[in-house]
């Protein structure tokens, strides 16, 4: 993550989407939230933010995916990011943002968080506000749990709400094939379904961890750069509730594994399904097979860098 020391007239910043290769959800807290422990991997689907000076704050969208249902008002996460940076630095002036989106919307891959991360970095450069890495990460955490990771990128362990990051070593490149649903799944609904499941089956299952942790096998597989090892330990506590709310995802998981995927996992709260392939050739074959089944499919690799300035 880098920023310029002097202001510019226009800035282009880019931030990646993510896959949660492991996600363990702790018990429901009194404040209504859950602590989590997750292994994030940034993947090669990007949000490109073009920032230009303006008197006010505005945003428009383009890109490879349908953005018609996105809000362009003040509650948009990118607008909130720009306003937060301006407020925290005392900057007077606004910004117009043009965001080219390639990360699926409401797909559990952190597209909105990537928008916010790239906006923070773009506006910091545009305005010459010279925030440090730690300052940008802290601002990101105010905006959402996944925003700090979109700034940092690579592979990392997230704890707390997912915003307390520690880097994790990942060797080599992992090949992912992503099946994109034509619908979104509400993150609060998925967490709510998880809580209801745990309450219904409290006598039959182990209680949720108060302080969740990422399994050591996940860290070992990432360090080894071994997709076969990683396939054995992919884990998501939100997968079962997501499948309950969207049963068709189970058929997608089965289809991918029948066509050569080492394993499949619902990414985050879904509904994107991420399939891990053994190598590039296997990923291409899987992409063709899933496309033939009339699924919307994207191939991506990870890990990749976090938010960075492209021009400006």
Swiss-Prot record:
Pathway(s) where this gene product acts: Isoprenoid biosynthesis; isopentenyl diphosphate biosynthesis via DXP pathway; isopentenyl diphosphate from 1-deoxy-D-xylulose 5-phosphate: step 3/6
Reactions performed catalytically: 4-CDP-2-C-methyl-D-erythritol + ATP = 4-CDP-2-C-methyl-D-erythritol 2-phosphate + ADP + H(+)
Classification via SUPFAM superfamilies: GHMP Kinase, C-terminal domain, Ribosomal protein S5 domain 2-like
Residues where ATP binds: 104-114
A GO BP entry: isopentenyl diphosphate biosynthetic process, methylerythritol 4-phosphate pathway
InterPro entries tied to this protein: GHMP_kinase_C_dom, GHMP_kinase_C_sf, GHMP_kinase_N_dom, IspE, Ribosomal_Su5_D2-typ_SF, Ribsml_uS5_D2-typ_fold_subgr
EC nos: 2.7.1.148
Keyword entries, A-Z: ATP-binding, Isoprene biosynthesis, Kinase, Nucleotide-binding, Transferase
Pfam families the UniProt entry points to: GHMP_kinases_C, GHMP_kinases_N
Top-level taxon of the source organism: Bacteria
Segment forming the signal sequence: none
MF (Gene Ontology): 4-(cytidine 5'-diphospho)-2-C-methyl-D-erythritol kinase activity; ATP binding
Catalytic machinery residues: 18, 146
NCBIfam families attached to this UniProt entry: ispE (TIGR00154), PRK03188.1 (NF002870)
Function: Catalyzes the phosphorylation of the position 2 hydroxy group of 4-diphosphocytidyl-2C-methyl-D-erythritol.
PANTHER family: 4-DIPHOSPHOCYTIDYL-2-C-METHYL-D-ERYTHRITOL KINASE, CHLOROPLASTIC
Family affiliation: Belongs to the GHMP kinase family. IspE subfamily.
Protein name, entry field: 4-diphosphocytidyl-2-C-methyl-D-erythritol kinase
Organism: Clavibacter sepedonicus (Clavibacter michiganensis subsp. sepedonicus)
